[in-house]
Amino acid sequence: MSGEPRKILVTSALPYANGPIHLGHLLEYIQTDIWVRFQKLRGHQCTYVCADDAHGTAIMLKAEQMGITPEQLIDQVNADHRRDFAEFLIEFDNYYSTHSEENRELSSYIYKACLDAGKIATRTITQAYDPEKNLFLADRFIKGTCPKCKAEDQYGDNCEVCSSTYTPAELINPRSAISGATPIEKESTHFFFKLPDFQEFLQKWTRSGTLQPQIANKLAEWLDAGLQEWDISRDAPYFGFEIPDQPGKFFYVWLDAPIGYMASFKNLCARRADLDFDEYWKKDSTAELYHFIGKDIINFHALFWPSMLSCADFRTPSAVYAHGFVTVDGAKMSKSRGTFIMARTYLEHLNPEYLRYYFAAKLTSNVDDLDLNLQDFTLKVNADLVGKLVNIASRCAKFITKAGGKLSPQISEPELIEQFLSKSDFIAQAYEDREFGKAVREIMALADLANKYIDEKAPWKLAKEEGKEQEVLDVCSVGVNLFRILITYLAPVLPGVAAASAEFLNAPIVWNRPLEPLTDHAVNEFKPMISRVDPKAVDAMVDASKDNMAQAPKDNGKAKKDKKEAKSEEEIAPTIKFDDFAKIDLRIAKIVSAEHVEGADKLLRLQLDIGSEQRQVFAGIKSAYAPEDLVGRLTVMVANLEPRKMKFGMSEGMVLAAGPGGKDIWLLQPDSGAQPGMQVK
């Protein structure tokens, strides 16, 4: 590493304090933790803070249902979150709560700064109101019959069966999801942040390199359409911070939630003499500030948040990094249907480092969704971590122990060692760029070389020959040094295995200076570092999750039931000859660009890179995908389909997708490692 150590502050989005962590949440915290551990391993002062998002109507109502106070609920959830994160080896420098005095003070300060700057408006609005509970109802707290498909028990703003959107007033037989009462309309005075006043600032900021291209393009659409004022207030009863000088009015949870990043850091600064709040948050700060978030909350972090910070004379983020969602075996996760695996359920059955590695192997810097394919998960972890990585150390250690437990005084293969060390900068840059999958592929390619070297030298055969003791020690000492380099590169991903490796190697894992090979160095007895994934344990985890799903509320909408039955009854097509199938040329394609087609309700225009050329394809996937979410993705296309002339242009192939249509369309996506132009066989 060269240059002065960087000062970096990193955050992950705040998990909501009304329930447990699940695998969909964990993608973000694992991604962030790997990046932070990498920065620390490289010698930088990198600080990682987070907190529970602990305000809002949902928390107030859940506490009431449980017969406890909101404070008791958020304390209980906070303890559960801390426990689960710790067991997944997520190492926060501070994990706090938005329900804190630091956050109250900072939220009030920022609000008053915006008020003094003339950026807060006041006006009267009409909302749905529960006359029994005496509270205003957000759309999600109103249920009724869909006005389009007549499915029952649908939310106040959208139908989960037919995907229609509407207003609560259009809902048939609306009722409060809290009390069952019929809502009435009632007026209230609300406070609004004048976001349109920051249009010019945001147009520049969102194009300044702070966002991924796909995200910047999406925000450009919103900016071009014109920004609306943002309602930052809620009426009592509400669990949160009361707005200064406005009795009965509270800050909307999304106002004080991101300020929770600042509050958590301020709380840490009070306990750490080496950290200064202003050094990281003042307007002219030279420290780096990064937010890792899900793509679904980008509007709060890339529009509202930088605008409020700028208005209150604080610095804005160096970058906001968004990621996609987690799917399991190709299906979208859904809380309402219970199709997710809880963090605690996973931990009861499997090693957390399995998931850390699998996520890392598939993570890129873009916003594509990540699929947790459980069969691939088992095969990949067993092949890479057990069959390749740890196998190197276990194959060599017993011979070194037999020779006295000390490595050879010389390195017999300096060129091979140098080949491994020469990849340091490439792998480090991949981590820096959040291209974890690229880093993992390079590391595993090196692991293959290390195992090939040991196979060719066959120390187990040499050990049977008289007078070959030194050669055996030389070979195995090279193997152990290669393992040390590999585990150094993987330490951000596998901190537990790295710690066990450091114990075996009798040397710390360091990556902030050139690695010198270990020679004439005593190592400790080798102990198993990670075991194979047991498919039965995976099955047991899935079964336990199914038990959780069975306890979830059942859907009463006949339309949804009919829809599911229709999916399952789709018949297999008639049998064809193999020669007929062989005529189809399927290729890996990279989506270079994607855009709406004027005048087409269902089509997106895709520009596809298939290695030797680019093709234009019109795909009927508009109902399921936003164009900006597709750019950079790999998919599969029929490359030898006769071009079809359409009124919008020539379509030069077909991309492959699954699903019945509407929002239920899933574009095929190959595993990481596939390259544009590769033939699918």
Swiss-Prot record:
Motif ('KMSKS' region): 332-336
E.C. numbers: 6.1.1.10
Subcellular location: Cytoplasm
PROSITE patterns named among the record's database cross-references: AA_TRNA_LIGASE_I, TRBD
GO molecular function: ATP binding; metal ion binding; methionine-tRNA ligase activity; tRNA binding
Motif ('HIGH' region): 15-25
GO cellular component: cytosol
TM region(s), chain numbering: none
Keywords attached to this entry: Aminoacyl-tRNA synthetase, ATP-binding, Cytoplasm, Ligase, Metal-binding, Nucleotide-binding, Protein biosynthesis, RNA-binding, tRNA-binding, Zinc
Cofactor binding, per record: Binds 1 zinc ion per subunit.
Binding-site residues for ATP, renumbered to this chain: K335
Any Gene Ontology biological process: methionyl-tRNA aminoacylation
Domain of life: Bacteria
Main location: cytoplasm
HAMAP family hit by this protein: Met_tRNA_synth_type1
Name of the protein: Methionine--tRNA ligase
Organism: Hahella chejuensis (strain KCTC 2396)
Gene: metG
